[in-house]
Amino acid sequence: MARDRREGLEIKVVNPPAAATNNVAVETSPATATRRRRQQQRASFAEFRPFKLWFPWLVPAIVVANIALFAISMFINNCPKNSAYCLARFLGRFAFQPMKENPLLGPSSLTLEKMGALDVSMVVHKHEVWRLFTCIWLHAGVFHVLANMLSLIFIGIRLEQEFGFVRIGLLYMISGFGGSLLSSLFNRAGISVGASGALFGLLGAMLSELLTNWTIYANKFAALLTLIFIIAINLAVGILPHVDNFAHLGGFTSGFLLGFVFLIRPQYGYFNQRNNPRGYAAPSAKSKHKPYQYVLWITSLVLLIAGYTAGLVVLLRGTDLNKHCSWCHYLSCIPTSLWSCKSQNVYCESSQIGQQMNLTCITNGKTEMYKLSNDIPSRIQQLCSQLCR
């Protein structure tokens, strides 16, 4: 019965508007409204990704190239053919030089010099400036190349994802050149190889990028302190003997200045106003960059050009900056009771037999034969140092 009476009924439920359910106006303070608006803007900014994420292929390619060049160096070195004693002789021509000669498990200094290692005498007297670039692609041993390439992967992948291969590639090469340049101005003896200067350039660029793009980062103080701590630890290692800290300092300084040039980004407010909803009236239009970013960009570019130009002029004139700076050597090595920074004097006897020169180290009695060439007389001291290790 009840069902029959209600069959023709149609019931509609209408929800009243929210304003009708509550006729009491709620007032919020200006500070609360501003805070809510900023939270909404930050939430929308987090969803809105204004910066393109790049696929990182350059850094892995650099790693592969460095490892390949190290393998080529070992192939050319051919220790069993050129030396009486070799480490891991079962590797054939890829065997390592003796530990006393190269504790990093790698080729001889002569092989690295043929491959393009940084030799100041070659740069100054033969004007082989290209060695300032080629040396950053070579490594002294297995331990050396592994340490540098792992660090490059750890640092470089993220930077390439954020800024692209063009800017990071230029940053890597120019920083490496800066490290080689400063190293050649102070380290006049021996040869130098390695990508450490370029790696420190990436660290320096990370620091300047954080400073110049300060407004777009959260937890910026924690990130800044962490980065400074990492940089300080790495630079502190450079005060140990046999570590080229001038290359580290030159690369870091170059990268720090290059970061202000290559890694500048628009400020937070610029992208925030672009993401405002339609109809929202912004208080004032934000410029793409802040004034201090322009100042840092111009200042850094001028310092880079002036520094590189002056450094090349001083280097090609053959000037030894150690004679003009009595304390600068402490930047690369600080003597303690555990080690000495002074190079031990070595003495050798030489004699010529036909087209070969016989060199004997007086300290350890080791003897080596060298084929005579035009540059052998000028490199006797270097060959003697290698023989007496």
From Swiss-Prot:
Q: Where are the transmembrane segments?
A: 56-76, 136-156, 163-183, 191-211, 221-241, 244-264, 295-315
Q: Gene3D superfamilies in the record, alphabetically?
A: Rhomboid-like
Any idea what a deletion of this gene does?
A: No visible phenotype.
Membrane topology value: Multi-pass membrane protein
Kindly list the GO CC terms recorded for this protein. Answer: Golgi apparatus; Golgi membrane
Its GO biological process terms? proteolysis
- Please indicate if the UniProt record lists Hydrolase as a keyword: yes
Q: What is its main location?
A: Golgi
Q: What is its EC number?
A: 3.4.21.105
> Which keywords, in A-to-Z order, does the entry hold?
Golgi apparatus, Hydrolase, Membrane, Protease, Serine protease, Transmembrane, Transmembrane helix
Q: Where in the cell is it found?
A: Golgi apparatus membrane
Report whether Protease shows up as a keyword of the record: yes
Q: Which reaction equation describes what this protein catalyses?
A: Cleaves type-1 transmembrane domains using a catalytic dyad composed of serine and histidine that are contributed by different transmembrane domains
| InterPro entries linked | Peptidase_S54_rhomboid-like, Peptidase_S54_rhomboid_dom, Rhomboid-like_sf
Molecular functions per Gene Ontology: serine-type endopeptidase activity
Tissue expression per record: Expressed in roots, seedlings, leaves, stems and flowers.
What does the record list as coiled-coil region(s)? Answer: none
Active-site residues, Swiss-Prot/TrEMBL = 196, 248
Q: What family is this?
A: Belongs to the peptidase S54 family.
Q: What does this protein do?
A: Probable rhomboid-type serine protease that catalyzes intramembrane proteolysis. Unable to cleave the Drosophila protein Spitz.
Q: State the name under which the record lists this protein.
A: RHOMBOID-like protein 1
Supply the source organism for this entry.
Arabidopsis thaliana
Give the organism's phylogenetic lineage: Eukaryota, Viridiplantae, Streptophyta, Embryophyta, Tracheophyta
